[in-house]
Structures are given as C-alpha cells and as structure tokens.
C-alpha cells in the first residue's frame, strides 16, 4: 500500500461520512450553497485509483451525485496548489471539474530566506508577490491569474516545523524539511 493513499472503498465511505457528519452541519462552509471540500495532495488521491484520471473522475462524480442527493446544489471541489502543477492541474480541472485552488502555507511557494528565523513581513511579501507576479514555486511560477480556476489566497499565521526535528542534536543546522527557519513577529501592531 502506498503511504498516504487509502483503498477505494475507504474513499467511498469517507464521502458518505463527510456528507452526513460535516456538510449538513449549519456552520459548514459552503460556496453558493455547495459544500467546500479540499484535496491536499492530488498525486496521493490519484494513487487510490492507480493514477488513472478516468477512474478517479468516476469517484469524484459519484461524490458529487451523493452531495446533490443530500440536498445541496453541488460540491465545491478545491485542490491545494503545491501538488497541482502543470499537467496535474489541467487534468484535475478537466476530469474532476475542480472549482478552485488554494495554498496550504506560504512556504510551499516562497523559500524563507534567513535562518534560523524569517520575519513575517518578509514571508508575506514573498508569497503575495508570487500570487500577483509569479516567480515563486510550486504552482506560482506564473501569477495566480494564470490558473484556469479561481485561486483562494492563504493567510499563514506563521511557520515552525522545529518540533518535528526529533530532538536532533543539530536541529539548528539548516537543511531539508523539517530543519528550516521559523516565521517570527506575526503579531499585528
């Protein structure tokens, strides 16, 4: 079994559960009446269906049908951009009728420049410049306006992956994740 992927039956059970437990809750976020559902890693989602877009599209359409049967106008399907690059994004829009894209965290698009910490304002500027003008990473190489579906910006409140460093003696040495800088000074004035 691939790390992170689940069985197709598990995905089907998940869709039933989220419709019943979450989508019907009065405070659940809906866009134009459609419950918002986001897939974090499309490549992992595709592994459930042996990387076959057509098979995965059938499962998404079944999900949409269940959502409509539950009384909603449709499903608002969102994809997290860092794993939706190039052909994967285009295929997700085409096969799954992806409604929007978003970002999980600024650092997926903008490498924090200073170590052991980077100022919040610097991280914000890097991310929002990528959204507006491109030149960033993982889906924001071009401005967000080039994405063929609406892009919902992200407001990261900070970033600190140091607790994931497993008490390493050299946790203060910059290298690959999670040994990176933290975002500091995000307190509004």
Predicted regions and their residues:
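Glycan-processing catalytic domains of CAZymes
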Residues: 1-189
């Amino acid at each position: 079994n691939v790390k992170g992927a689940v069985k197709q039956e598990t995905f089907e059970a998940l869709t039933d559960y989220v419709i019943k437990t979450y989508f019907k809750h009065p405070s659940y976020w809906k866009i134009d009446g459609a419950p918002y559902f986001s897939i974090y890693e499309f490549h992992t989602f595709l592994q459930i269906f042996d990387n076959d877009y057509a098979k995965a599209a059938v499962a998404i359409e079944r999900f949409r049908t269940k959502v409509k049967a539950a009384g909603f106008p449709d499903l608002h399907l969102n994809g997290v951009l860092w794993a939706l690059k190039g052909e994967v994004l285009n295929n997700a829009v085409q096969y799954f009728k992806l409604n929007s894209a978003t970002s999980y965290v600024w650092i997926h698009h903008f490498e924090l420049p200073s170590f052991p910490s980077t100022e919040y304002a610097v991280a914000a500027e890097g991310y929002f410049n990528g959204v507006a003008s491109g030149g960033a990473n993982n889906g924001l190489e071009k401005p967000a306006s080039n994405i063929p579906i609406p892009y919902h910006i992200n407001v990261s409140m900070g970033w600190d992956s140091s607790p994931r460093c497993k008490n390493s003696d050299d946790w203060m040495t910059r290298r690959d994740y999670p040994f990176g800088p933290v975002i500091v000074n995000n307190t509004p004035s």
